[in-house]
């Protein structure tokens, strides 16, 4: 994990933005002179054009979301933004929670975090552009591989369409990797939206309904221990003294310390 310190002042500023709401996240920096590798899954043959997307050999479209789902529907919302411009149905994406990286900074906080109803307004244009640029590279690669003009091609839910033929995005990954974006691809006008602003199902609904969704409480790593905070019975009270002997004598207790 790549972490750096964030000042108390900066944390308070970020907290103020949320209007007293919860901020969950990590502080990261863009000041390092050494590029930090993207914290994405290493899959043979996969194309990772940016920090948010991967296209796998089987044409799985993997989206890394850098905002925490806390019931507010942000996973569906952010996948919808990138899916709109990439021309991939969000329900067909493999969506994963992103790791820590400077590319995932919430610009409203100056650090990687979720809160203050900021996810959509902070990343609306960014993720749409991510999708549009990736689609643009795929179309350019397809044009080269098929020997046709890019204007003769269209896309449809993860496929490049040429006449009556359909080719998966993954078919053009090898060529796309050699291309670069000189100018941002144009974004769709609102009149052409298929997913943004439309009624849709939640991308995580089935996982939650079947109990397969993973949350923080589900994390289990070797030699992991659990901590419990014993709070004062009244607000603002502070412990005058702590006798931890009895607690430490209980089975399973490793340590007791004051906060």
State where each predicted segment sits:
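Cofactor-binding beta-sheet edge motifs in enzyme active sites
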Residues: 2-28, 32-259
């Amino acid at each position: 994990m790549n972490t750096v310190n964030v000042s108390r002042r900066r944390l308070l500023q970020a907290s103020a933005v949320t209007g007293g709401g919860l901020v969950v996240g990590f502080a990261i920096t863009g000041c390092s002179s050494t590029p930090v590798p993207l914290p994405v899954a290493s899959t043979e043959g996969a194309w990772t054009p940016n920090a948010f997307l991967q296209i796998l050999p089987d044409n799985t479209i993997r989206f890394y979301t850098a905002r925490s789902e806390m019931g507010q529907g942000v996973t569906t919302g952010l996948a919808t933004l990138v899916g709109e411009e990439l021309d991939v149905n969000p329900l067909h994406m493999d969506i994963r929670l992103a790791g820590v990286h400077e590319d995932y900074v919430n610009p409203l906080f100056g650090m990687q975090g979720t809160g203050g109803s900021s996810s959509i307004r902070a990343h609306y244009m960014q993720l749409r552009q991510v999708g549009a640029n990736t689609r643009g590279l795929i179309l350019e690669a397809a044009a080269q591989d098929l020997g046709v003009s890019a204007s003769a091609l269209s896309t449809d839910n993860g496929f490049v369409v040429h006449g009556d033929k359909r080719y998966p995005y993954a078919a053009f990954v090898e060529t796309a990797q050699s291309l670069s974006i000189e100018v941002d691809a144009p974004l769709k006008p609102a009149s052409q939206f298929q997913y943004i602003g439309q009624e849709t199902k939640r991308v995580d609904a089935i996982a939650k309904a079947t109990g397969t969704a993973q949350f923080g409480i589900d994390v289990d790593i070797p030699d992991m221990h659990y901590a419990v905070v014993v709070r004062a019975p009244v607000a603002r009270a502070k412990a005058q003294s702590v006798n931890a002997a009895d607690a430490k004598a209980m089975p399973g207790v490793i340590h007791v310390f004051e906060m």
